[in-house]
Amino acid sequence: MPAHMIPQVARAVVQSTYSGSLSAIDDNLEPTDDIDQAAYITTGRYVVCALCLATVSDSPTQLSRWVFHHCSDDRRPLIRSMLLASSRHAHALRESREVDMRRISRLVHQADEEDELDAPRQARRIGYVDLHSCDLQNPTPELATRQLCNDPTRTHSTHPHLARSHPYMLPTAALDIDPPEPVTMFATMSRTDGVPMLFNMTHRNVEVLASPAARASLMYALLKLANAKLTPKQRSIMYGPSANDMVAACTKACAATTFRHVGRYAARVVIEE
């Protein structure tokens, strides 16, 4: 396998493990449900040796490559461990989805369909706001928390920004929305990675939604309000990574210039605390 593919394959293996979609391949390069017979693992796209990450095939429908790949027998315990972990995550996700779906009907409302006065007193009102990432002239953490983008080629000087040098701080900015009441939390997500995040306007920081239940609830509500469908990549990010992986993904997304505004929706999301 080319060296440049190792991170890509490793990331696919990790995501498949956390999303519960990792499956087993036997010595004959055939899918199997018997963990003890597993010689390789597949992410759905790559058939991989779990020990050395050698790519046996780029596709489960083309299992003719590297048939004579031989690696240490020590890989079988590792494969078994990864498959069991994937199975546990799949079971946990099924349970969390069931819980989320029940809670969503009770906790999530669209403002144009239900009187906002009926929202619980302790409810936290969440709005959707545009988010941009900019190259600042002096990208220091201190200035990153205070300076707005002055790029004349863009027309979003009134938007809150995330500076690339300090991805977890939201600079003070004049919001271009006029909420009917004070809004302290704004929700958005990376257009490249689909990572859902909450922006705490009081503390000026970013909260990555590490809880699978919280991620599922918020993402489902936002996509429902946006009338959008969940793509496989977004679903993988939403349910798959652990808290540490979510933070890493958020850091990468926030620090990239490809982190653009994702749109703003008139509907409000009300989630009970």
From Swiss-Prot:
It comes from Aquareovirus G (isolate American grass carp/USA/PB01-155/-) (AQRV-G). It holds the Pfam family Capsid_VP7. The gene is S10. Keywords: Capsid protein, Outer capsid protein, T=13 icosahedral capsid protein, Virion. Interacts with VP4 to form the outer icosahedral capsid with an incomplete T=13 symmetry, about 80 nm in diameter, and consisting of 200 VP4-VP7 trimers. It comes from the Viruses. It is found in: Virion. Interacts with VP4 and VP6. Its main location: virion. GO terms for cellular component: T=13 icosahedral viral capsid; viral outer capsid. The lineage of its organism: Viruses, Riboviria, Orthornavirae, Duplornaviricota, Resentoviricetes. InterPro entries: Capsid_VP7. The keyword ATP-binding does not apply. Signal peptide: none annotated. Belongs to the aquareoviridae outer capsid VP7 protein family. This is Outer capsid protein VP7. Coiled coil: none annotated.
